[in-house]
């Protein structure tokens, strides 16, 4: 189960956690040294925060990276099961619904799902039902 960040987003550690997740989302996987260099942060602080992100379910240890010489660093990346995203494209007479894991990999894409768009509570409930069904199927 993924835990939430601190309510106080100005907290230095929360800011660093957000930046680590942004780096992984935008640029892929990193070693502790890479994170520390990108964030201009000490290696011990980075190690502690990456450990917390792993414990909270946001990141995972992807193993050792091959290296020509020296000690091989551990690589860390987003945990694809940390959460997912749902995109809904509404047309007048159908909907397209896509789900993606936390790493951005497509889990499902349901095209031309029967749905009539109306400005009513019932239409909204039906749309929520379609989305819920898509989530349950994944």
Model-derived regions: residue spans:
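N-terminal helix-turn-helix
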Residues: 29-62
